[in-house]
Amino acid sequence: MKNRLNVLLFLLILSTGLYLTRSFWQGWIVGAFSVLITITVVFIGIVIFLENRHPTKTLTWLMVLAVFPVVGFIFYLMFGQNHRKSKTFMKKALSDEEAFEKIEGNRQLNEEQLQKMGGHQQLLFRLAHRLANNPISFSTNTKVLTDGKETFAHIKQALRMATHHIHLEYYIVRDDEIGQEIKEILMQKAKEGIHVRFLYDGVGSWKLSKSYIQDLKQAGVEIVPFAPVKLPFINHTINYRNHRKIIVIDGTVGFVGGLNIGDEYLGKDPYFGFWRDTHLYVRGEAVRTLQLIFLRDWAHETGETILKPSYLSPALTNMKDDGGVQMIASGPDTRWEINKKLFFSMITSAKKSIWITSPYFIPDEDILSALKIAALSGIDVRILVPNRPDKRIVFHASRSYFPELLEAGVKVYEYTRGFLHSKIIIVDNEIASIGTSNMDMRSFHLNFEVNAFLYRTKSVTTLVSDFVYDLEHTNQIRFEQFRNRAWYYRVLESTCRLLSPLL
């Protein structure tokens, strides 16, 4: 109630101030415009207030509207509206339920297998099942791929071996060397009669050439943009982007992780140099869930529902048990902020260690508090971030969180070998998450994401080893040294942090 009163008081002061300043302006046009702006700002402020957002985000938007009323109003229409609880994604939510009915048998949690887990591990996977309805598989093999060279070598080989269908879903696709290689393989497979479907994000891949798309279409590839933006008409859902990176081949082989399709992911960009990223190669039952995630997104964009047995039939269910694997999709089409809640559960259930790798580290208050409490409780909390920016505002906003984390005992490291783009969480060396979700508010609240949650698989052991190896190529940030950094860095970081609820 106190927060709401503060917001209402802010709106009252803002409205009064803007109205009084109108008397100092010259001309009735300017006066009328000021009244219009006042009414608009107050109206939008009331709308934001009634949405019951987090107070920090509410006040940030009000500040933007107050300082930059015209630009702030436009930005709010483009990026500020909350559609999670609206009917914007209703069609997609309905298709989810229809799709899950097709694999009901595989949705049931394997109680016998779950009993082998520890208590807090059981709670995590049950929570994931409740939030996302996705099953856990104990008949899936996974392999960690640690850079672009290894990842694209596996992807190209798997694509060439396809016999029935290829499904791709990517945030960024570039018409460069690796993009051309992937295109040529897809065109060849389509000409062989393989059904190829390609879903790319309309904003992330806005530079993708028309000739690239046309070549694929002429070869028989079905390629569709996700939520395309057609200037000058900007859709109000422009801020909700498909950040997923999924490949499914013949329903039995899948890929998921942090790498998009572009030469920079192979370390060919001179600014970034070596690109440290992580992808997951998947074979077996859990591929069905990746398939389902793709088919739901495809149905949402095209209206074409492809829930056939040839796509959703059991995939290599006789594979040797290699621990539990659970594919989880999250996004604004879900009732809950799934990835955030699962990350929070992982952090709060940790007994020994929490190791996080994230290129964009902008936690909300819940995650930030959980990390500090864990460190203060004696848990080994380590966070690995890049030491060079690709998004400068995000980079400096991220650094503003370091002092309070360091003071609580969290160890923060900056990766120095190249650019770090992996999105990993490892808890107690037993449970891990690998996928597309960053530890930031955009991934929590706005983007469509997908993550693989792993329990006691060989891949968890690999991720632990990779994290230890990556630490050899870092500089550890020390609290005393960092808090004595130049004042202008502190001002810059604090300013960027003010915008963090909007990033």
Swiss-Prot record:
Q: Which InterPro entries match?
A: Cardiolipin_synth_Firmi (IPR030874), Cardiolipin_synthase (IPR022924), CLS_N (IPR027379), PLD-like_dom (IPR025202), PLipase_D/transphosphatidylase (IPR001736)
Reaction(s) catalysed by this chain, per the record, are: 2 a 1,2-diacyl-sn-glycero-3-phospho-(1'-sn-glycerol) = a cardiolipin + glycerol
Q: Which positions fall inside the PLD phosphodiesterase domain?
A: 238-265, 416-443
Task: Kindly list the places in or outside the cell where this protein is found, as annotated in its UniProt entry.
Answer: Cell membrane
Q: What is its main location?
A: membrane
Q: Which GO terms describe its molecular function?
A: cardiolipin synthase activity
Q: Which PROSITE patterns has this protein been placed in?
A: PLD
- Check the record and name the SUPFAM superfamilies matching this protein: Phospholipase D/nuclease
Q: Which keywords accompany this UniProt record?
A: Cell membrane, Lipid biosynthesis, Lipid metabolism, Membrane, Phospholipid biosynthesis, Phospholipid metabolism, Repeat, Transferase, Transmembrane, Transmembrane helix
Give the membrane topology: Multi-pass membrane protein
Q: Name one Pfam family in it.
A: PLDc_2
* GO CC annotations, alphabetized: plasma membrane
> Which catalytic residues are annotated?
243, 245, 250, 421, 423, 428
Q: What's a BP term from Gene Ontology annotated to this protein?
A: cardiolipin biosynthetic process
What stretches pass through the bilayer?
A: 5-25, 29-49, 59-79
User: What is this enzyme's EC?
Assistant: 2.7.8.-
Q: Does the keyword Zinc-finger apply?
A: no
Query: Which CDD domains does the annotation name?
Result: PLDc_CLS_1, PLDc_CLS_2
Q: Ribonucleoprotein among the record's keywords?
A: no
Q: Note the superkingdom of the native organism.
A: Bacteria
* Role summary: Catalyzes the reversible phosphatidyl group transfer from one phosphatidylglycerol molecule to another to form cardiolipin (CL) (diphosphatidylglycerol) and glycerol.
What's this protein's family per the entry?
Belongs to the phospholipase D family. Cardiolipin synthase subfamily.
Q: Which HAMAP family match?
A: Cardiolipin_synth_Cls (MF_01916)
* The protein's name: Cardiolipin synthase
State the species of origin: Halalkalibacterium halodurans (strain ATCC BAA-125 / DSM 18197 / FERM 7344 / JCM 9153 / C-125)
